[in-house]
Amino acid sequence: MRFAALETSTDWCSVALWVDGEIHSLERRVPNRHSEYALPMLESLTRNAGRLDAIAFGAGPGSFTGLRIACGLAQGLAFAHGLPVLGVSTLEATAEEAGAPRVVACLDARMREVYYAALEKRERRWHEVIPAQCVAPAEAPKPPGESWVGAGNGFAAYGDFGLRKVLPEVHPTAAAVARLAAPRLAAGEGVDAALAVPLYLRDKVALTLEEQRR
């Protein structure tokens, strides 16, 4: 199986190519400039790859603009080449990058909130112990038990949430998206491009003036 993966939900823009279990990837930190870099990076990576079987992308949550870029690019390529598309949770991709079996994934959602989930890896898949949510840091639920590792830039912005170990530098990558997408695509979970949608977790992009004064 050969497919491409995209991830543009944070300041990082990354692309990956999966070829029969081998991953090739490119990554660059380009805040607010993903639209300039994503397609050229992907074209550079896949130029000599031959026909792709699918497109995977980081569906969210994350930057609204970044999610639309990844989803739109995945849809455009899928429509053009008749390929299925698969969206992958950016919180799961963050957990995948953390390298631990029990991960609290926490991404800065701005507006004094975080995108947050507690995930446990069983049988090569991530399972939600605490469902993905957009929440104020002080209201984030604590995961049960011990041995949880925190991962994501939400910890850089708001502290360690009481966890013993946090990895604030960890972020979702296209390589992680590819690793998570591979078994799902093999199982036929890819969908028509028209059905691919971002996962926002909230429906507002800015605070009102009243909210800013609080």
Task: Write out the residue ranges for each language-model feature.
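DPxDG-like acidic metal-binding loop motif
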Residues: 54-85
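Acyltransferase
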Residues: 165-214
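Surface "functional belts" at beta-alpha junctions
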Residues: 23, 27-33, 83-173, 200, ...
